Amino acid sequence: MERVLGIGGHFIRAADPAALSAWYRDCLGLDADENGLWRQEAGPTVFATFESETDYFGSRSQQTMLNFRVRDLDAMLAQLRVNGADVADETQDMEGVGRFGWVTDPAGTRVELWQPA
């Protein structure tokens, strides 16, 4: 059986794609090239499904949630706050999995940040 090799991309609709790309670059350090190519560091990737009634993604109208691995969750959340980002007050610790925090991008999309255990 053929298998997928990994996530090949994540595509986001935006009223102002250039401004949203700049936010991801300036606030999260996602330095994609002019074609959108970004080379991520090696590490685990989670693929999970959720019940349709979940509130975990924030708004129920949001059908998927992007999760970025980070080295230091506290430092990333502080950096986002300094940049004026909409950062959730709470974080979550899951034993053996890691720590989680959330930011909402300028387009209103909730993004999860994960510091693996």
PLM-predicted stretches and their roles:
Residues 27-31, 67-69, 90-93:
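Short linear motifs in intrinsically disordered
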Residues 59-85:
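Mid-chain, well-packed structural core segment of small domains
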Residues 28-63, 103-106, 110-116:
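Conserved short beta-strand elements that form part of the metal-binding/catalytic scaffold
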Residues 18-19, 74-75, 98:
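Short alpha-helical
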Residues 1-6, 12, 78-117:
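Vicinal oxygen chelate
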Residues 1-7, 11-48:
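Core segments of cupin and vicinal oxygen chelate
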